[in-house]
Regions:
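Serine-esterase "nucleophile elbow" of acetyl-processing enzymes
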Residues: 1-57, 61-62
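Alpha-helical cap/lid subdomain in secreted, periplasmic
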Residues: 22-25, 44-213
């Protein structure tokens, strides 16, 4: 029996059930019941989550954070986590993960879909005063995805420098945005979750078996 840890925000919560099914009975999957949110929340959470599972021996960890970090949820309208901070916290998170196992997979942030362009004009979620600056949780599709690619590229370089495998979930979804991304512009449709689950399970199985992707 192999022990695998799955970490991530709502995207992980969406594909996790199918990943468990695809990995089969010879793999025990540990994962938080809660949304792992932004990267620093995950760094804080790892200790308590591991403790809640009885601090099991870990054969592999597959994780991703980033979508929460890219939201503009503060009154200044800036990205919640600047790139430099995102990289530093991911560096610390990688060290944390390496303390459990050297068999690690970090997954890239998936792209947003065309619905972002439709929802943005009326998506003033913080400032309700018409005279106040508009603050949105996301952005239009192109600038949102440009930020996603920028953060993915920097984090990929960081992970690869540490010998950590990278599961490129961005590329799985990119090119199929209408098919795979839902009407909220961020979360996958069922077909999107399914294709992500297959890719995650495939990469986990390859890493457990010691084969190259």
């Amino acid at each position: 029996m192999k022990n695998v840890v799955l970490i991530g925000a709502s995207i992980r919560l969406g594909y996790e059930k199918e990943v468990r099914e695809l990995l089969g009975d010879d793999v025990q999957v540990f994962s938080p019941k809660e949304n792992c949110r932004y990267t620093k929340f995950t760094l804080w959470g790892m200790f308590s989550w591991m403790e809640s599972w009885g601090s099991p021996h870990v054969d592999l960890i597959h994780w991703n954070t980033g979508i929460w970090d890219l939201h503009r949820c503060t009154a200044d309208g800036l990205l919640f986590t600047p790139l430099e901070e995102y990289l530093e916290v991911n560096r610390r998170l990688a060290i944390q993960m390496e303390s459990y196992t050297k068999n690690l997979i970090w997954a890239t942030i998936i792209p947003g879909g065309p619905a972002l362009d439709k929802k943005m004009p009326g998506n003033s979620l913080i400032n309700t005063d018409a005279s106040a600056p508009k603050v949105h949780l996301t952005d239009y599709m192109e600038p949102w995805n440009a930020d996603v690619r920028r953060y993915n590229a920097a984090a990929t370089e960081l992970m690869q420098s540490r010998g950590i495998r990278v599961n490129d979930l961005y590329s799985v979804i990119d090119g199929h945005l209408d098919e795979y991304i839902s009407e909220d512009g961020i979360h996958p449709r069922p077909a999107g979750y399914s294709v992500l689950a297959r890719k995650v399970a495939q990469e986990i199985r390859r890493a457990l078996d010691g084969t190259e992707s």
